[in-house]
């Protein structure tokens, strides 16, 4: 079956079929191999791409810029303070302006409705670099990384546990990705931090077709048993007030990924994943503040696990670029 994603938006995985998601992962694997072999074919020569960042970024910005440059495209970066978007000009108007000048637009910011509006009115492919609800490019990188570290297996044969704040964009997106690809996902969190019930129901409906297994539990021991991968994310997301830390640390400490949790999987080959940045020691400004306030040298993951041989976080980070490149090539490439 020939799959064409030409001129499609990439706003959330719910918009894509399992075959289309697998196609993007396979393309990313091919592009990664070609880059490393020095034989990458450029398909975005002469294309101009706008990168809208209403939230700061390291990995996402670098991944989009390097991917675009590798493929021969030019980029314009519009940072949090570098445009009139939402201040003097609506997103609907911005979309219609940028769509006349650019061949593709990336957006990283706040509500999902904003990137949906951008996608509706731009007239060119729009890609979601992160919203409060979803982070689809990260999930492509995660699924690619899982396949790389489970040779001979397909995604429906893999299981993973996500510990921590399961109601954030990563919890939402991992659940959607697992449902679409027929995987076994366990979301382990306090019940008040489970994903929205409507999204859970939607994912379970998808799972009834794909064979995915979706488990929501407060029990770490039950949830992690037998999984292939352990996944976590920060306990306080971008945009949440600093005052949320005290309550969050109290609620989430039992869900920290530490060696005890690794052992509880019963899988000597279990791998660790994190979308980054991670609070795993006191070597950052925030890390030092956390240590002083709560006496903790790591939050969602310990230094021991983060730096262990089973940690795939930097493979995962690299794969952000390859999967983002695949999205741009598939939707915009010649």
Swiss-Prot record:
Origin: domain of life: Bacteria
Keywords, comma-separated and alphabetical: Arginine metabolism, Cytoplasm, Transferase
InterPro entries: Asp/Orn_carbamoyltranf_P-bd, Asp/Orn_carbamoylTrfase, Asp/Orn_carbamoylTrfase_sf, Asp_carbamoyltransf_Asp/Orn-bd, Orn/put_carbamltrans, OTCase_ArgI
Chain sites annotated for binding carbamoyl phosphate: 57-60, 84, 108, 135-138, 275-276, 320
Compartment list: Cytoplasm
Disulfide bonds: none
Gene Ontology molecular function, alphabetical: amino acid binding; ornithine carbamoyltransferase activity
EC number in record: 2.1.3.3
UniProt record, GO biological process: arginine biosynthetic process via ornithine; arginine catabolic process to ornithine; citrulline biosynthetic process; L-arginine biosynthetic process
A Pfam family assignment: OTCace
Top-level EC class as recorded in UniProt: transferase
Pathway(s) it belongs to: Amino-acid degradation; L-arginine degradation via ADI pathway; carbamoyl phosphate from L-arginine: step 2/2
PROSITE patterns: CARBAMOYLTRANSFERASE
GO cellular component, one term: cytoplasm
Annotated L-ornithine binding sites: 169, 233, 237-238
Function text: Reversibly catalyzes the transfer of the carbamoyl group from carbamoyl phosphate (CP) to the N(epsilon) atom of ornithine (ORN) to produce L-citrulline.
The family this protein is said to belong to: Belongs to the aspartate/ornithine carbamoyltransferase superfamily. OTCase family.
Record's protein name: Ornithine carbamoyltransferase, catabolic
Organism this protein belongs to: Salmonella typhi
């Amino acid at each position: 079956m020939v799959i064409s994603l030409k001129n499609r938006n990439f706003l959330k995985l719910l918009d894509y079929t399992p075959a289309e998601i697998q196609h993007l992962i396979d393309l990313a694997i091919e592009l990664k191999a070609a880059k490393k072999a020095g034989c990458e074919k450029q398909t975005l020569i002469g294309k101009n791409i706008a990168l809208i960042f209403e939230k700061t970024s390291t990995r996402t910005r670098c991944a989009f810029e390097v991917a675009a440059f590798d493929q021969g495209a030019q980029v314009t970066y519009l940072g949090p303070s570098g445009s009139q978007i939402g201040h003097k000009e609506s997103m609907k108007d911005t979309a219609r302006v940028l769509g006349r000048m650019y061949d593709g637009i990336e957006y990283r910011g706040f509500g999902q409705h904003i990137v949906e509006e951008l996608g509706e009115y731009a007239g060119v492919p729009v890609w979601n670099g992160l919203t409060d609800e979803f982070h689809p490019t990260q999930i492509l990188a995660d699924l690619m990384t899982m396949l790389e570290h489970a040779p001979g297996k397909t995604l429906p044969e893999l299981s993973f546990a996500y510990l921590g704040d399961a109601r954030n964009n990563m919890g939402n997106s991992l659940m959607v990705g697992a449902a679409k690809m027929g995987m076994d996902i366990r979301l382990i969190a306090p019940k008040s931090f489970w994903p929205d019930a409507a999204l859970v129901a939607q994912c379970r409906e998808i799972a009834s077709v794909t064979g995915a297994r979706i488990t929501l539990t407060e029990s770490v021991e039950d949830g992690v048993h037998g999984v292939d991968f352990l996944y976590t994310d920060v306990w306080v997301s971008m945009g949440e007030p600093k005052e949320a830390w005290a309550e969050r640390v109290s609620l989430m400490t039992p869900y920290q990924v530490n060696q005890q949790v690794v052992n509880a999987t019963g899988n000597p080959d279990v791998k660790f994943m994190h979308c980054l940045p991670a609070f795993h020691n006191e070597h950052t400004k925030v890390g030092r503040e956390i240590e002083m306030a709560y006496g903790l040298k790591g939050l969602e993951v310990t230094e021991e696990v983060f730096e262990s041989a089973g940690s795939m976080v930097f493979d995962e980070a690299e794969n952000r670029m390859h999967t983002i490149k695949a999205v741009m090539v598939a939707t915009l490439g010649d």
